[in-house]
């Protein structure tokens, strides 16, 4: 289990999280929900070690075993769909590429470059690349942005089967209702009562 206790995060004079506490179960999918700008992405960045809280503690995270899907896809325009996966997989695991593409419903796109992908396809590729890391914790920032809902729900079922906990950000009601746990963030400065 991951425990966050009394996290306070500020940027200059602006406090985004104010003594915020919560737990992430050791398995399953936990969703973060709330309006834009309330601290969801900041919270993921703190858990990934990319931002330092001003105060508070995070327990139960092994930094090198954490995978973060950024809010933007960060695809390399000169690399094919397949190469985006082989770039993060050791050569001994390249045989997994077809299954990884199937997970993201990208079969047949192996030799396609990012410029030829739709926004939803690019997002699914970024998600497949993140999941290929086989982490102990997945932090997913809007993993289904631009993905049609029926496809997102199919991929969602595969996320729920992962052996590691997933903490994701979503605004989609159907995704939130399918989560094992939902943490509502209602606006800065976010605080636990």
Predicted regions, residues:
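The feature captures the beta-strand-to-loop junction immediately N-terminal to the Walker
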Residues: 33-35
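Helix-to-loop junction immediately C-terminal to a conserved catalytic motif
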Residues: 48
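Q-loop/switch helix immediately C-terminal to the Walker
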Residues: 79-96
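Conserved ABC ATPase "signature" region
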Residues: 94-109
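Conserved ABC ATPase signature
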Residues: 113-121
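Hydrophobic anchor residue at the start of the ABC signature
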Residues: 127
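Catalytic Walker B motif of ABC-type/P-loop ATPase nucleotide-binding domains
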Residues: 138-142
């Amino acid at each position: 289990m991951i425990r966050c206790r009394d996290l306070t995060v500020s940027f200059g004079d602006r406090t985004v999280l104010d003594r915020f506490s919560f737990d992430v179960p050791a398995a399953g999918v936990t969703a973060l929900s709330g309006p834009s700008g309330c601290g969801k992405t900041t919270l993921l960045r703190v858990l990934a070690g990319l931002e330092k809280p001003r105060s508070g503690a995070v327990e139960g995270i092994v930094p090198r075993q954490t995978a973060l899907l950024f809010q933007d896809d960060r695809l390399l325009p000169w690399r094919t769909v397949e190469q985006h996966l082989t770039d993060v997989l050791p050569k001994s695991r390249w045989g997994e590429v077809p299954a990884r593409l199937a997970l993201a419903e990208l079969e047949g796109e192996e030799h396609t470059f990012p410029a030829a992908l739709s926004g939803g396809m690019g997002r699914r590729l970024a998600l497949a690349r993140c999941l290929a890391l086989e982490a102990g914790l997945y932090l997913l920032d809007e993993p289904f942005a631009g993905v049609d809902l029926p496809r997102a729900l199919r991929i969602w079922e595969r996320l729920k089967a992962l052996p590691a906990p997933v903490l994701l950000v979503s605004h989609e009601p159907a995704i939130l209702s399918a989560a094992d746990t939902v943490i509502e963030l209602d606006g800065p400065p976010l605080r636990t009562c």
